[in-house]
């Protein structure tokens, strides 16, 4: 008998994602002007207010207020009625210097022996059920919200859309773990109060709310979903769409109050959305606002890079990779592999892990250099997932009245590159 599996995603306008994007925008600007910056930036967003806190060691000086306001404006919080607006919200900073006790564990005379910025375990996961080696349920959940954001920005249809939104996708699998159909799609999107009640009575209000909901539900099914389907170019995924999909659209009936006014947002509260949607495992460490000396981030990217290349090379159909560190120690304590019984090589998972240890240098500095993590590449990761994205080179411009303007070419999502497949095939005789 088969089973159902569900993953969720949240939009760039979700309050926790607003916080993530501000934290990573601060990180990017510091790295742009001082690549050696050590950063741990946390953000809180609520009604009309942004609070920044954390620890930083840098030679750069940046305008934190301006960074926060630019992010909020780009997301789309530009109207006073949202109760959180880029020009009028308060921005309070409580950022201070990094602890020298932490820094002494990271800095080394030999840069390659740079210690891990903290203890912990990090996981990478990959599966061959999608072209980007991501869980299908999460990939679709991200895609729905990316298309919804495109529609909102175009402003031609569904003109009532506001920035906050969530999605959830449930996939039915057979006994072999193969997706067979999409079972349920949930879309909750913030919207304008675009139909006013005829009078102040409760019945009139309910009637207006029901009319709005009917329009939103129709538009999600007839406008949003066809565009989502049109963006998919994988025949096996397209075949999973069917006329029996259950749609839950704004199930509470109304979603006018949203964003940071509806829910307080914090950096690092969407770690499953950021990674694998509940598949694989998670060590608990969030990513956004952390420079790559924090192995919570850099080692998680490295583990994903390993898992994706291993699956792409044909070592297994699905793979989980764990690495762990002690603070101040360069080399990982362990490498663990789980192929879920879906390996294609005549080796135990422990033996596979030992080959990985020989192929990949997992010291923090080596990870930084291999994946080019000392570049300002992080704001793009802070919405719609850190994994499964398309590697690309982009030109980024930074403006500073203190440091001068700067233009840099950077490579995004380097951990998604399939650049170790040939080495892995050679090592495993594939």
Segments predicted by a language model, with ranges:
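N-terminal, positively charged regions that mediate nucleic acid binding
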Residues: 1-40, 45, 421, 427
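Short, charge-patterned binding micro-sites
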Residues: 40-58, 327-331
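Structured core elements
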Residues: 40, 51, 92, 122, ...
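Internal helix-turn-beta structural module
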Residues: 46, 316-318, 325-430
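Alpha-helical support elements that line or immediately flank enzyme active sites
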Residues: 12-31, 129-149, 290-314
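Conserved phosphate/anionic-ligand binding catalytic regions in large, soluble enzymes, centered on
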Residues: 8-10, 14-19, 115-130, 256-281, ...
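Glycine-rich, mobile lid/loop segments that gate access to catalytic sites or pores
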Residues: 6, 66, 73-257, 388, ...
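C-terminal catalytic subdomain
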Residues: 269-271, 276-320, 331-338
């Amino acid at each position: 008998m088969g089973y159902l599996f569900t993953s969720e995603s949240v939009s760039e306008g979700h309050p926790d994602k607003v916080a993530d994007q501000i934290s990573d925008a601060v990180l990017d600007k510091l790295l742009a002007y001082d690549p050696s910056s050590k950063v741990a930036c946390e953000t809180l967003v609520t009604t009309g207010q942004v609070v920044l806190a954390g620890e930083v060691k840098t030679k750069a000086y940046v305008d934190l207020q301006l960074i926060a306001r630019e992010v909020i404006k780009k997301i789309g919080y530009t109207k006073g009625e949202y109760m959180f607006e880029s020009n009028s919200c308060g921005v309070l900073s409580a950022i201070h210097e990094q602890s020298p006790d932490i820094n002494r564990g990271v800095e080394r005379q030999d840069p390659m022996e740079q210690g891990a910025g903290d203890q912990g375990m990090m996981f990478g996961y990959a599966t061959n059920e999608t072209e980007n080696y991501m869980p299908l349920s999460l990939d679709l959940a991200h895609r729905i919200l990316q298309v919804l954001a495109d529609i909102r920005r175009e402003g031609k249809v569904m003109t009532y859309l506001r920035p906050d939104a969530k999605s959830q996708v449930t996939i039915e699998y057979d006994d072999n773990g193969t997706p067979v159909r999409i079972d349920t799609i949930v879309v909750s999107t913030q919207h304008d109060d675009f139909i006013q009640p005829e009078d102040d009575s409760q019945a009139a209000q309910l009637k207006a709310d029901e009319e709005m909901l009917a329009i939103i539900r129709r538009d999600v099914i007839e406008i949003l979903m066809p565009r989502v389907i049109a963006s998919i170019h994988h025949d096996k995924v397209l075949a999973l769409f069917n006329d029996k999909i259950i749609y839950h659209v704004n199930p509470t009936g109304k979603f006018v109050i949203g964003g940071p006014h509806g829910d307080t947002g914090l950096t690092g509260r969407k770690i499953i959305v950021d990674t694998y949607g509940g598949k694989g495992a998670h060590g608990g460490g969030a990513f956004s606002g952390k420079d790559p000396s924090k192995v919570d981030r850099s080692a998680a990217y490295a583990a994903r890079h390993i898992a994706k290349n291993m699956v792409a090379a044909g070592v297994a159909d699905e793979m989980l990779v764990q690495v762990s560190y002690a603070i101040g120690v360069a080399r990982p304590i362990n490498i663990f592999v789980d192929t879920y019984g879906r390996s294609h090589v005549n080796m135990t998972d422990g033996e596979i892990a030992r080959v990985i240890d020989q192929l990949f240098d997992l010291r923090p500095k080596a990870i930084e250099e291999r994946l080019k993590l000392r570049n300002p590449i992080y704001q793009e990761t802070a919405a719609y997932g850190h994994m499964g994205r398309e590697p690309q080179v982009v030109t980024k411009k930074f403006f500073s009245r203190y440091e001068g303007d700067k233009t840099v070419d950077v490579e995004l999502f380097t951990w998604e590159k399939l650049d170790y497949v040939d080495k892995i095939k050679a090592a495993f005789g594939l």
